[in-house]
């Protein structure tokens, strides 16, 4: 049984829209990182859906999605480490307070 492409695209579009909404409206740094992860998961879903639709015997989309997941995990670890370091100095995770590069 093959998963139909439109279901993958609808789910990926919904995830992408939720991620964009969270990215735009959130002022908390941890929520922003979670929204970025949602965006990357929507991209992964598109990669796997199109890969399955175009050539089910080829696994290029799945392999590329694994690379994206690996990069996303590294990005989340570095991002959370930066947020934790800023929280220790500023006692907040509000994005408006992250003005460390200002004079």
Swiss-Prot record:
GO molecular function, one term: oxidoreductase activity, acting on NAD(P)H, quinone or similar compound as acceptor
Catalytic activity: a plastoquinone + NADH + (n+1) H(+)(in) = a plastoquinol + NAD(+) + n H(+)(out); a plastoquinone + NADPH + (n+1) H(+)(in) = a plastoquinol + NADP(+) + n H(+)(out)
Membrane spanning residue stretches: 5-25, 32-52, 66-86
UniProt-listed GO biological process terms: ATP synthesis coupled electron transport; photosynthesis, light reaction
EC number: 7.1.1.-
GO cellular component terms, A-Z: NADH dehydrogenase complex; plasma membrane-derived thylakoid membrane
Location of this chain's protein in the cell: Cellular thylakoid membrane
Membrane topology field: Multi-pass membrane protein
Enzyme class, spelled out: translocase
One Pfam family recorded for the sequence: Oxidored_q2
Major localization listed first in the record, in broad terms: membrane
Keywords: Membrane, NAD, NADP, Plastoquinone, Quinone, Thylakoid, Translocase, Transmembrane, Transmembrane helix, Transport
Domain of life: Bacteria
InterPro entries xrefs: NADH_UbQ_OxRdtase_chain4L/K, NUOK/Mnh_C1-like
HAMAP family (alphabetical): NDH1_NuoK
Task performed by this protein: NDH-1 shuttles electrons from an unknown electron donor, via FMN and iron-sulfur (Fe-S) centers, to quinones in the respiratory and/or the photosynthetic chain. The immediate electron acceptor for the enzyme in this species is believed to be plastoquinone. Couples the redox reaction to proton translocation, and thus conserves the redox energy in a proton gradient. Cyanobacterial NDH-1 also plays a role in inorganic carbon-concentration.
Family assignment from sequence similarity: Belongs to the complex I subunit 4L family.
Subunit structure: NDH-1 can be composed of about 15 different subunits; different subcomplexes with different compositions have been identified which probably have different functions.
PANTHER family referenced in this protein's UniProt entry, alphabetically: NADH-UBIQUINONE OXIDOREDUCTASE CHAIN 4L, NADH-UBIQUINONE OXIDOREDUCTASE SUBUNIT ND4L
UniProt protein name: NAD(P)H-quinone oxidoreductase subunit 4L
């Amino acid at each position: 049984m093959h998963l139909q492409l439109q279901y993958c695209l609808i789910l990926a579009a919904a995830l992408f829209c939720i991620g964009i909404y969270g990215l735009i409206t959130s002022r908390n740094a941890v929520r922003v990182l979670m929204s970025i992860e949602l965006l990357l998961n929507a991209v992964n879903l598109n990669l796997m859906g199109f890969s399955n639709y175009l050539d089910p015997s080829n696994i290029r989309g799945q392999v590329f999605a694994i690379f994206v997941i690996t990069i996303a995990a590294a990005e989340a670890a570095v991002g959370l480490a930066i947020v934790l370091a800023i929280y220790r100095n500023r006692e907040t995770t509000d994005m408006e307070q992250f003005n460390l590069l200002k004079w």
